[in-house]
Amino acid sequence: VSRISQYANTQNKVNDADFTANNPALIEIEKFSRFVLSPITPENNMQTNWFFERARGQYKTLRSKEGFTKSRLAAFDLKYPKKQMFTKVELAKYINAWQEVYNGKSLVIGPHIVVRGNEKNYARFMNYNLPEIKHIDVAYFEDAIAKAILFKAADKRYGTKVSGNQIGELKQVVVPYTLSLLNIITAGKLDLYKIWKNQHISMALSDFI
C-alpha cells in the first residue's frame, strides 16, 4: 500500500523525500527553526529565523496564512527571510558535505554522496546522518545553520559573476568537496558557533575557500 501511495499522484512529481516529512527528528528540527532566533549582528539589527521547510510548500502556505494584510506580510518576510528558508533535501546537502560518516569500514556519508544528486544524498542522510530526536537540541540546530551558511558562501563564491570564479556545472562537485576538505584540514575544529553568531563567514575563510 505504501508503494502504491508513493506513485498515486500523477499530476505532480512526488519525491521519496516527501514521504519522510513526519519523521520525529525532522519535526524536532522544525520546532527549533521556529523559536531559535538568529543573533543580532552589525549587518542586521533584527533577530530573524531560519525557516526549515519540513513539508513541501510549508513556507508559501504559512506566508499566505499569516500575511493577509500588507503589514503582516512585511512582518512575516522580516521574521522569515526567503533567503533563510531551507528544505530537508538542502539540509542533507549542508550536513553530508561537511561530515564524513562510516558504517563499519564503508564510507557512507561524504561529498562523494552529495554529488550523486539530491535523492540519493537525502536517502543516505536519513539512513546514516540524521540523529535520534534526543540528540537534536539548540546546539545541533545552530551547527546545522552554520553549515548552511558555509555551503551557501562556497556556492556563491564559485557561481557568480561578482566572484569571478564561475565554473559552471563543476560547482556541484567543487563545493561539497571543498567543504569536506576544509573540515579535514581543520581537524573538525572550525568554530561553527562563531559562524552562527556572525551569520556569515570571515573574509579570511572566504578567501581560503
What role is predicted for each listed range?
Residues 2-195:
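C-terminal catalytic or substrate-handling cores of phosphate/nucleotide-
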Residues 200-204:
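Phosphorylation-prone, low-complexity intrinsically disordered regions
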